Amino acid sequence: MNTYSPKDVFEQSRVAQLEQLPVTLYETPQAGALAVARHIADEIRDRQAKGQKFVVSLAPGRSTSDVYAELVRMYREEGLSFKNVEFFDLYEYYPLADDRLGNHAQLSRQLLDLVDIPKENIHNIPGNMPKEDILSFCREYEWQIAQAGGIDFQLLGIGRCGNIAFNQPGSSFISSTRLVVLDNNSREDAKIMFGSVDQVPVSAVTMGIDTILQAREVMIIAWGEHKSGIVRRAVEGEYNVSCPASALQHHKHTAVLLDISAAAALTRMATPWVVRSCEWDDRLIRRAVVWLCRQTDKPILKLTNKDYNDYGLSELITRFESAYNCNIKVFNDLQHTITGWPGGKPNADDTNRPERAVPFPKDILIFSPHPDDDVISMGGTFARLIKQGHNVHVAYETSGCIAVCDDEVIRFLDFVRGYADLGLLQGGDAYRKYEEYMHFLKDEKIGDQDTREILDLKALIRRGEATAACRYMGLETDHIHFLNLPFYETGSIHKAPLGDADISIVRKILEEIRPHEMFVAGDLADPHGTHRVCWEAVLAAISQLRETDAWQEWLSECRIWMYRGAWQEWDIDQIEMAVPISPEELRFKRNTILKHQSQMESAPFMGNDERLFWQRAEDRNHATAEIYARLGLANYEAIEAFVRYKME
C-alpha cells in the first residue's frame, strides 16, 4: 500500500486513524508548494469572478518560499492578478533597527513587491513603532482584520517547538495580536536572518492563536525530516498549550501539507503495522524488528513469538513461521552491513560485504558540500580509505565563505600585517589592504553584505583549513579539489538556483577521475539546503553522462554511498554500510575536525545544537554503535553509517 496516497477512503481512514488533523502528503517539497500555490491562485480567481476580495495572511520563511515563487511565476506567465487580494502580516520582529530585515521585508522580496497587489491593501506590522503605541496598534490591527471581513486564508509554517507565528509553547489558545518576548529557540531560529543571536530582536508583535483560528481556512505546511517530530506532536498529540499548533485540531477547515520527510514520524510512516496490514520488504522487516527490540528492551536473537504477537507483528510470524527465523534473517542482514573495508577487501569473498573486492585499489571521489562535511561526517572512513591504499580524491563543492565570522578574517589580517612588519613582505600593498579591510569590517552593519574581496579571504581561510585536515590524514594536495560552485557565491544565505555552470563543474571532475566509488552528502531533508543542492548537482551531472554511450560502462560499475552531516544519522533500517571506528581512530577524527578552527565556537551557522561539530560527530557515532550493540551485535566504540544510492 502507498502510505502517502491511499487508494480509497477506507485505506485513508485506516492509515490516518491516529491523526487529529487532515494530512496530505507529497513526494517532494516542490510538489507540495505547487499544490499550495495553485490552491491560493484558484481562490483568488474564484473571488475575482464574484467581484470579492480575498483576504490572506502568509508566513515567511524557507518552507513557503517555493509557494511564493510559483505565485510570482503565475502572475508573470499566466496573468494571475493580485488586485483583489488584501494582505495582513502574520508577525513582525520588534524592535527592528533596519527595515531591510524582518518578516515584512522578506515577504516583500519574495512576493509582495513582485506582483500587482495594491499598496493600500497591504497591512504590515511596523517593527519600529514607539513602545507606547504597541498596545493600541494591536487593538487597531484586530479591528482592521474585522473591517476586512476576516481572514479568508491563513498560511502557516510550524516551529520546532510547535509554535505557529510567534505563539510559543504556553501561549493561550484565546490570545489575540500582542507583543511577545521571544524565547531562546525562536531567537536561535532567526539568527540566520540577523547574522547572530545577539542581533535578533528580543520580542515580536504576532497574531494570536485565536486570531489565527478565526481564519476561514488554515493551511499549515512543513518540509524536511527536521520537522517530523513536531509534526507528529501537532497531528497525533494532545490538544495542549505545550504545542501551540495543536490548537488547529479544533479548527474546522485546517489542512496539513507535508512532504515524505516531514511525515516520517507519523504512525502511518514510522510504524505502519500499528494501523494496517503491510506489504513487507526487507527494509520494513528490519525496521519492525528493531522497533520491537526497543519496545521489549531485548536484543534481536532473544525476541520470542509472544513478543511479536503482543506488539502487533504476528504477520511476521506467519511469514517466517517462527520468531527464530525472522530474528536470524534480520540479525544477519545487520551483521552484513558491518565492514572495516569501506573500499572493499582485496582477495576476499565479497558476497555478503557492502563493497566489492575488485578493483583494488579503487579510484574514490568524496564530495563534500562544505569544506568540513567530509571529516565531520565520514572522517574515520576517509582516513581508512587512504590507509588501505585507495586512490582517494576529495571535491569541496562550495567555498563555505559565508560561514566564517569577521573575527577570523581580522586574525589573519593581523598575521599578514605582522608578517609585513617583520620585513618579510615587500611593498606597501599589505598595509593599504589591511587598512581598507579593517575599515570595512569595523563599519559593517547588520544586513550589509561582505565585499567580494572579504568573501574571498573567508573562502581562503576555509580552503587552508580543509587542506590542513587532508594533509593530516595523509592525502596528497593534488588530490584536493575546490570546485567553488557558482550557485553558492551570492554573499548571503540566499543562494542562486542550481545552474548549468554548477553542473558542468561537477561533470568535469567526474570525467577527470572516473571513480569506482563515490561518497556524497545525503542530507536531503532540507529543500533549500546547500547539501541538497550539491547532491542535485551530482545527480544532474551523472544524468548528462548517462546520455552518452561512452560513459554507460563506467556508471554501471560506479557505486555511490550517501553519508549524513552533523545534524542527524541514518535510521538503522536504512543503513547498508557501517564502518566501525576504534577509540584511537575516533581521536584521530576529532583532531582532523579541529583543523577547521573557524568552525569552532565562533562559527555563524552552528544551528540549534550548542555542541561543537566534533562533539556532535562523536556523539552520533557513539549512538550508532550503541544501537548495534543493543541489538546484540558487536560492541564498537563508534560507527559511521552509509546508505547506497542505486542508479536506475
Can you name each region flagged by the protein language model?
Residues 187-195, 199-204, 296-365, 384-388, ...:
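Metal-dependent de-N-acetylase/amidase catalytic core
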Residues 1-55, 349-351, 358:
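N-terminal glycine-/serine-/threonine-rich phosphate-binding loop
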Residues 61, 366-375:
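Short, glycine-rich nucleotide/cofactor-binding loops
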Residues 55, 86, 152-153, 217, ...:
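Structural motif
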Residues 2, 10, 20, 27, ...:
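Conserved phosphate- and dinucleotide-binding cores of soluble alpha/beta proteins
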Residues 67-73, 164-176, 528-544:
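Short Gly/Thr/Asp-enriched flexible loops that form oxyanion-binding sites at enzyme active sites
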Residues 46-77:
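Glycine-rich N-terminal segment of FAD-binding domains in flavoprotein oxidoreductases
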Residues 67-78, 374-399, 403:
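Histidine-anchored nucleotide/phosphate-binding helix
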